Amino acid sequence: MTGLNLLAVRAIYRFEMARFGRTLMQSLISPVISTALYFVVFGAAIGERMQDVGGVPYGAFIVPGLIMLSLLTQSIANASFGIYFPKFTGTIYELLSAPVSYVEITLAYVGAAASKSVLLGLVILATAAVIVPLQIEHPFWMLSFLVLTAVTFSLAGFIIGVWADGFEKLQLIPLLIITPLTFLGGSFYSIDMLPPVWRTVSLFNPVVYLISGFRWSFHGTADVGIGVSLGMTLAFLIVFLAIVAWIFRTGYRLKA
């Protein structure tokens, strides 16, 4: 094959998006309702009794963090299940033996997972705008961070789906690592509110940089520089791309 097989990419992509449509309650409605409850409790109820954070009302302040929380978890979940299920049923071998390159397989699965996550993020954003006062100072960068993060962590989910040898392992890393890092990464607070020691410790949490950059696109303020946030996100992307390339080069947990 001399070029990209767009027909194959489109076929896999459409299949994954169709699965998203069949599981709409679980894939879209449930995360939106769960996040909306955070907005109601922390934003509308508790937020009215709290001081502004860096001049931003608390309800609006937590919006980027909560969107990022859903974006990270759903990107990983969508991509990991998308590639794990063919492994579980054995159809992955038909895919690997078909005239489809590894780049096309990755592009289709990761593209579908990222599309679902971006759609979810935009729906949550629209829901938040109804519940709390909200403004976006840098719409271009907001969309850029949204898409870049969705693609990056869809790659992470793809890796987890290949690595997992059971359904329980699909949730292992998201539950034990991603969710705690997101909650401790400034979703509900600014790390500047922490004592100096814990502020320094927080800088070792990579999710801090993702949330900080995304929050900057909304309010123009951030815990770390926007360049550092963008650099960390791109670093994640490069690392995950390298791991995916290694997986296909070695056939790790793909070849019988």
PLM regions with names:
Residues 1-139, 144-256:
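Hydrophobic transmembrane alpha-helices and immediately adjacent juxtamembrane helices
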